[in-house]
A protein has these predicted regions:
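Long, low-complexity, intrinsically disordered segments
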Residues: 471-480
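Anaerobic metallocofactor- and corrinoid-dependent redox/one-carbon enzyme cores
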Residues: 2-174, 182, 189-467, 477
């Protein structure tokens, strides 16, 4: 197919669909680094015009990465649902954008087509959309998953509680865990990024989280975010594992660099499901992704980083995960230079994931050497929450002391819930009310020093005596 567009007296020609996609992408440092970005704003607009006129069916006939060379491409093509695609098969990319923004694109209609939308189709239409378009369309996509609670219902935003510690110290983790629970965080998952890769340490962390969840009957799930093969070994040794985690990418070579294949993920999912630890559902997988991972592994095949990211969602979709999130600014300014680029990428990732039927959240974050700050994260958080993001990640004080990057704090997540009227997962919401942590109106309450959660976790891990304030030492939201 010939890809071209004329602006004024200049005719712009593009050699392939892959080139059109890359040049049409909003400016970002990773694509400049890869040498695939537009040379000018005019060229970028011409590529968008050419892309808008491209039939969606083209993506089924012209693979950006050859079928013979890449397992992810084979997965995308072989798993494509022609019946789900039929209602939109006659559309161009531009027509698809118009339909997504129309009243015809109801939640039911979007759910019906999700298995017919390939990652490249999702990425392509996102390149034609303003930020507000990404928000409007994503908000209409409803994706619900279940393990010990129900995640993704309308009007709700879950929070991953991330109690990391640089030495995996049990007392430090417990203090962060207590802090997060007192702010109403943790309904998405209580997930630790361990500093150690020792199997004994990993299993001990799993046991500690399981003990806390069981002792206080918390309707949530835990996860220790180590390599998938270590988690399989932990299951074999009888560890109380809830969710299997793995970082994934959008090309076979990227996943090879992570030490993972589809066969390994198949094995891990089967092992986790065999434990039957879910009480309201059996979505047992948790994935993380991020724009730039393919280029950092020299595995992008000349494809722009946002399209590579969307292709990772095809891998995730195979496993019907409980959770998936983009760690949007974590990889650094080499790939997303500043707050503007991070905000745009976060909205793109959320839209593409939701359009493809994934329960996608976001680690709203940045590294300390990026041209970004907490004001940018405030903006992205509010935009994503408005767009119906499934969950966000929160750490004490927004500063992850183990991974050394800046994320959201527990009170940031509480702020977003408060100003937009969002609630936690329903089972977790009831638990917060029953425990006296939250009121019927959702506001966080001040608790007494003898509160069973404060006293229990403090005694369990020999923490200092609680003083009656929320665990972070500041005044609890909703307190007089």
């Amino acid at each position: 197919m010939d890809y071209h567009a004329t602006i004024g007296t200049t005719r712009h020609l593009f050699g392939s669909l892959r080139e059109v996609m890359a040049i049409a992408t909003p400016r970002r440092s990773g694509d400049l680094l890869a040498g695939v970005a537009a040379e000018s704003a005019q060229q970028r607009m011409a590529a968008r015009m050419a892309l808008a006129d491209t039939p969606l069916a083209t993506f089924l006939n012209e693979a950006l990465i050859p079928y013979e060379d890449d397992a992810v491409t084979r997965l995308i093509i072989d798993s494509h649902d022609g019946a789900a695609f039929a209602p939109i098969a006659h559309l161009t990319v531009g027509d698809f954008r118009d339909w997504l923004l129309s009243e015809s694109a109801t939640p039911a209609a979007l759910a019906a087509i999700r298995l017919g939308v390939t990652p490249e189709m999702a990425a392509a239409v996102s390149k034609l959309m303003r930020n507000q378009d990404l928000i409007v369309a994503a908000r209409k996509c409803q994706v619900t998953t279940r393990f010990r609670n129900t995640i993704g219902l309308p009007g709700r935003m879950s929070v991953r509680l991330q109690p990391n510690h640089p030495t995996d110290d049990a007392r430090g983790i417990a203090a962060s865990l207590l802090d997060g629970l007192m702010y109403g965080a943790g309904d998405a998952v209580i997930g630790i990024n361990p500093a150690s890769d020792s199997l004994a340490v990993l299993i001990e962390l799993m046991k500690s989280l399981d003990d806390t969840i069981s002792r206080f009957a918390i309707p949530t799930q835990s996860c220790v975010l180590t390599h998938v093969t270590s988690q399989i070994k932990a299951i074999e040794q009888g560890a109380p594992l809830d969710l299997v985690f793995q970082s994934i990418g959008g090309t076979e070579q990227t996943n090879t660099s992570f030490g993972v294949t589809l066969a390994i993920l198949d094995e891990a999912q089967a092992a986790a499901r065999s434990l039957k630890r879910g009480t309201v559902g059996h979505n047992v997988m948790y994935f993380e992704t991020g724009q730039g991972s393919a280029l950092s592994a020299r595995a992008n095949h000349g494809v722009d980083q946002q399209t590579c990211e969307a292709r990772a969602y095809a891998v995730a979709r195979r496993y019907s995960p409980l959770l998936i999130n983009s760690v949007v600014g974590f990889i650094g300014p080499e790939y997303l230079y500043d707050g503007k680029q991070i905000i745009r990428a976060g909205l793109e990732d959320h839209f593409c994931g939701k359009l493809m039927g994934l329960p996608i959240g976001c680690d709203v974050c940045y590294t300390n050497h990026a041209e970004a700050d907490s004001d940018d994260m405030d903006t992205l958080l509010l935009l994503l929450a408005t767009a119906g993001v499934t969950f966000v990640i929160a750490v004490p004080g927004a500063d992850d002391v183990m991974l050394n990057y800046q994320s959201l704090s527990f009170h940031d997540a509480l702020y977003a819930r408060s100003v937009l009227g969002l609630k936690p997962a329903p089972e977790f919401e009831r638990w917060l009310i029953q425990m006296g942590i939250a009121g019927e109106d959702g506001g966080i309450k001040r608790v007494a020093a003898g509160h069973p959660l404060l006293a229990g976790i403090a005694a369990q891990h020999r923490l200092g005596a609680p003083d009656g304030n929320n665990a972070s030492g500041g005044q609890a939201h909703g307190a007089p």
